[in-house]
Design a protein with these regions (language model features):
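ATP-binding N-terminal substructure of ATP-dependent carboxylate-amine bond-forming enzymes
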Residues: 1-119, 123-124, 128-130, 134, ...
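Active-site nucleotide/adenylate-binding loops and adjacent lid/helix of ATP-dependent enzymes
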Residues: 2-9, 13-14, 21, 83-87, ...
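Residue-level detector of anion-binding/catalytic polar loops
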Residues: 36, 117, 145, 211, ...
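A glycine- and small-aliphatic-rich helix-loop capping segment at beta-alpha/alpha-beta transitions
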Residues: 109-118, 196-199, 327-329
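Phosphate-binding site of ATP-dependent enzymes
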Residues: 190-277, 298-305
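C-terminal active-site "lid" helix and adjoining low-complexity regulatory extension at the edge
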Residues: 270, 289, 298-358
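Short, basic/aromatic recognition patches
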Residues: 280-284
Length: 358
């Protein structure tokens, strides 16, 4: 019997378009002899769309948003999920929601309450990894080296601009980066060379979050590692993008047709081993399961800095995460998706054995 696979995508997030591209690639790769695919599109306004069995043949990207909408968010969530998950048969949810309300533990909490297996990280690890400020505190406690950083809330900025700016200049200096604490895909990030640019960067970052992170710039390479698994995760060979951009922003990541990958990255065996071990340590530190991508900086002196851990990395067929696995152990894209589904089912089965009453 086919497993019913419910693919969640879209969502109330500035990373909505990234989610659509990811869902399109994943759905096309699914083996329809094993899975019956039901797309659940969430609009930018938060409305959930009725899932119908999808015809993968001839699928176009626009087909993923041409679905009927319900009248209200509360009604639609109840009708869509409860009616579907009450049906007999094996079922798994594949959340492909990037950023707010999808990668922060919100949807994961709902799926936990519904008691259905879902791919990827749980409530706690999703929340921890998306909040860069909290994540950095965890990494520091674990003794993992990071770049110098400061965290500011919006109320601190409103209370005293000059105090924030002075502290940032004294402790971080220039050039520096300003980031929203809880966004991915390099959205809302600015590279600043002086006070004027820093003010503009802080203002921009606060458009997307009420907490921001300032980081000292590291001159060097950006290295990425894919991690997969539950209690005993595996780390891929490291990879890096080869590009001429000083600042690898959203447009560079998703629009640059000249972007090239180097997998495995040209590193010594010692550095390669160190990166893979640190990636798994960070994965455990955040209580991750299923998958994550861990990003590092490597400066000219050979010093490694863990930049961030991404609980739902880019997952199109040209994204670094799936390509790193293909070049590490030959795992093809469709096989990778099935492995992640298997990890979700195993984690769910383990949770069912936990006793919740005395």
């Amino acid at each position: 019997m086919q497993t019913k696979l419910y693919v969640l995508y879209g969502g109330k997030s500035v990373e909505h378009e990234v989610s659509l591209k990811t869902a399109y690639t994943v759905i096309q790769s699914i083996d329809n002899s094993k899975f019956e695919v039901f797309p659940i599109y969430i609009t930018r306004e938060g409305l959930w769309c009725s899932p119908d069995k999808l015809n993968q043949e001839g699928l176009q990207l626009n087909d993923l948003i041409a679905l009927p909408k319900h009248r209200s968010e509360a009604e639609s969530i109840g009708q869509v999920l409860m009616s579907q998950f009450a049906l007999p048969g094996k079922k798994v949810v594949l959340p492909l929601l990037h950023g707010s309300y999808g990668e922060d533990g919100t949807v994961q909490g709902m799926l936990e309450l519904l008691n259905v297996p879902y791919v990827g990280n749980g409530v706690l690890s999703s929340a921890l990894t998306l909040d860069k400020a909290i994540s950095k505190q965890l990494l520091a406690q674990a003794g993992i080296h990071q770049v110098d950083y400061r965290v500011y809330r919006y109320d601190q900025w409103l209370e005293d601009h000059s105090k924030v700016l002075q502290k940032a200049e004294d402790t971080i200096g220039y050039p520096c980066y300003v980031k929203p604490a809880s966004l991915g895909s390099s959205i809302g990030i600015s590279r600043c060379h002086d006070k004027q640019e820093l003010v503009a960067g802080i203002t921009e970052a606060f458009k997307y979050d009420n907490k921001i992170v300032l980081e000292r710039e590291v001159i060097g390479r950006e290295i990425q590692v894919a991690v997969m698994g539950n209690e005993k995760p595996l780390a891929s060979l490291p990879g890096e993008f080869i590009h001429d951009h000083v600042f690898f922003d959203f447009e560079s990541k998703y629009m640059d047709k000249q972007l090239k990958m180097s997998i495995p990255a040209h590193l010594s065996e010692e550095i390669t081993s160190q990166i893979r071990q640190l990636a798994i340590k960070a994965y455990h530190t955040h209580n991750c399961s299923g998958l994550a991508r861990v990003d590092f900086f490597l400066d000219g002196k050979g010093q490694l800095y863990l930049n961030e851990i991404n609980a739902l990395p880019g997952f199109t067929n040209y994204s670094m995460y799936p390509v790193m696995w293909e070049r590490t152990d030959g795992t093809r894209y469709s096989e990778l998706v099935e492995k992640l589904i298997d990890y979700a089912i195993m984690r769910h089965a383990e949770k069912q054995s936990i006793q919740y009453t005395r």
